[in-house]
């Protein structure tokens, strides 16, 4: 039924005709997410009529039908202004049983009404900044958090739980004040960690899950997304012993998530949200990833269970096949693996054995090939600076932050970006808590080491001499042409002579020489003026 006909029926006020018109409209547009511009004014008129009835109170008998129509029209951005009012939002919050000013409904609420109201609120908060502001002012997050805390005691349908969590996610994603309120005032990390444990159906010390059912997967992903929103700066925050224990408890549940498969084809998506949240944990809490007890069939390395680290590495390999949104795909898992390797020697040595095994092929450039090392070295020259930074950082840590070792595995040309950023172009080693790892060279590498081009990282075929057959006069002529070309480029500032500062940073040659001379003068006691 057309919006104009439905609006006409509403204006007549005849209940049966109105109900039938709304039901017909709902059936026809249940899967409509885009709308015809030609009927925009009719839809806006219908929305205003619905709002007037909503604010006065919907008939209990046909409440679900009215809310379904509101939900459909709330997808239309041209109708948002009508619905995004304080009175409309309050009415929807009351039907969803999350209005802060209302007493809890004594009798069990109508779950169909509650669900439709939640869906309407999700649509409005997603698309309307005004609705976002009003929802924050109405403190809807308080009653939502209360209901999430009741999931252990009261049985709510899957869809109600899912849209409770979806609304929490939208509010925390779009409103900084709601994010802080849930984190601090409502103890959101503890609340949602408990909800995650309930959803997974495991305790931290129990055996890992095998497959998480579809509905539990959907709810778990929403919980992970909300937790990500409210803990995004936890990695930078100093935490006390109580908070550290809570984050470790959360980490053990995330360990279950990493090891579990999701029903259907959502495993990679599920693991993606898990890895995103792992990246928010305080660094000292990542030790839980290596705390899994050894059991039959587990992957042991240096007496430590590496099942979780191996699963994260397998996830990284899958993500490296992505061709779009590479930063979102690989940066989180690379960051988690980097910190695990930096802080835990067994993890670093295990990852190095998998990613940077002893070099044998010395005739292929490090970025060429299908090995994990080759793919990561290719990322070191990616256009996205964040992608190349995390890839280089990961490989650098696997090399125990040793510059010669890093160059050996990646080539100086690929390594130059990180070395320049770290002030290590002249070599050396940054401060770091690393033991002296052995880096055993293969026989193939030792034999070819003297012939390896450090810039490309491989043995280069000897190129032909371009001056072969030239007379001395011709050679001198070509040399002067080259000098003149460089001089012209330099004078027009297309290129600039560079040098190495005493601190290991690339700088202009003139500045580098000045800094070197200043350093020599300051260290020479005889150079002080009289």
Swiss-Prot record:
The modification Phosphothreonine is found at residues 440, 442. GO terms for biological process: adenylate cyclase-inhibiting G protein-coupled receptor signaling pathway; basement membrane organization; cell migration involved in gastrulation; cell-cell adhesion involved in gastrulation; G protein-coupled receptor signaling pathway; gastrulation; in utero embryonic development; response to light stimulus. Its main location: cytoplasm. Changing residue 225 to A: Does not affect ability to fold GNAQ. Changing residue 383 to E: Reduced ability to promote guanine exchange of G-alpha proteins. Changing residue 435 to D: Mimics phosphorylation; partial ability to fold G-alpha proteins. The modification Phosphoserine is found at residues 435, 501, 522-523, 527. Changing residue 435 to A: Decreased ability to fold G-alpha proteins. Chaperone that specifically binds and folds nascent G alpha proteins prior to G protein heterotrimer formation, promoting their stability and activity: folds GNAI1, GNAO1, GNA13 and GNAQ. Does not fold G(s) G-alpha proteins GNAS nor GNAL. Also acts as a guanine nucleotide exchange factor (GEF) for G alpha proteins by stimulating exchange of bound GDP for free GTP. This is Chaperone Ric-8A.
């Amino acid at each position: 039924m057309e919006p104009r006909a439905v609006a006409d029926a509403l204006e007549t006020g005849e209940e049966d005709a109105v109900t039938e018109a709304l039901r017909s409209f709902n059936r026809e547009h249940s899967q409509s997410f885009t709308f015809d511009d030609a009927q925009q004014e009719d839809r806006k008129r219908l929305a205003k009529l619905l709002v007037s009835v909503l604010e006065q109170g919907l008939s209990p008998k046909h409440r679900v039908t009215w809310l379904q129509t509101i939900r459909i029209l709330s997808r239309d951005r041209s109708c948002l202004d009508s619905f995004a009012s304080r009175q409309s939002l309050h009415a929807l919050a009351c039907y969803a049983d999350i209005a802060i000013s209302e007493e809890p409904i004594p009798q069990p609420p109508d779950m169909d009404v509650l669900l439709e109201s939640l869906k309407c609120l999700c649509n409005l908060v997603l698309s309307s900044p005004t609705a976002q502001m009003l929802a924050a002012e109405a403190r809807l997050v308080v009653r939502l958090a209360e209901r999430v805390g009741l999931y252990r005691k009261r049985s709510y349908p899957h869809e109600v739980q899912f849209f409770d969590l979806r609304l929490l996610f939208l509010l925390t994603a779009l409103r900084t004040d709601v994010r802080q309120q849930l984190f601090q005032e409502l103890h959101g990390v503890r609340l949602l960690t408990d909800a995650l444990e309930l959803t997974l159906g495991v305790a931290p010390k129990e055996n890992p899950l095998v497959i998480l059912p579809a509905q539990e997967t959907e709810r778990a992903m929403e919980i992970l997304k909300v937790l990500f929103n409210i803990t995004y700066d936890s990695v930078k925050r100093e935490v006390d012993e109580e908070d550290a224990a809570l984050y470790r408890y959360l980490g053990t549940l995330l360990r279950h998530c990493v090891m579990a498969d999701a029903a259907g084809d959502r495993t990679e998506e599920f693991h993606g949200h898990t890895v995103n949240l792992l990246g928010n944990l305080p660094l000292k809490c990542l030790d839980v990833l290596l705390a899994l007890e050894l059991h039959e069939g587990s992957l042991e390395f240096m007496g430590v269970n590496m099942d979780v680290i191996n699963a994260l590495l397998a996830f990284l390999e899958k993500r490296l096949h992505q061709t779009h949104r590479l930063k979102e795909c690989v940066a989180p898992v690379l960051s988690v693996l980097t910190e695990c390797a930096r802080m835990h020697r067994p993890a670093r040595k295990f990852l190095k054995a998998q990613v940077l095994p002893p070099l044998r092929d010395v005739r292929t450039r490090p970025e060429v090939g299908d090995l994990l090392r080759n793919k990561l070295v290719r990322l070191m020259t990616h256009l996205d600076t964040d992608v190349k930074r995390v890839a280089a950082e990961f490989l650098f840590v696997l090399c125990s932050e040793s510059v010669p070792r890093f160059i050996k595995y990646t080539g100086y040309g690929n390594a130059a970006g990180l070395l320049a950023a770290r002030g290590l172009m002249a070599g050396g080693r940054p401060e770091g808590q690393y033991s002296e790892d052995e880096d055993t060279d293969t026989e193939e590498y030792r034999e070819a080491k003297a012939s390896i081009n450090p810039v490309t990282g491989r043995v280069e075929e000897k190129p032909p001499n371009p001056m072969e057959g030239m007379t001395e006069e011709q050679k001198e002529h070509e040399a002067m042409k080259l000098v003149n070309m460089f001089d012209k480029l330099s004078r027009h500032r297309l290129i600039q002579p560079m040098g190495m500062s005493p601190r290991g940073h690339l700088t202009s040659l003139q500045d580098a020489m000045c800094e070197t001379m200043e350093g020599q003068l300051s260290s020479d006691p005889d150079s002080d003026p009289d």
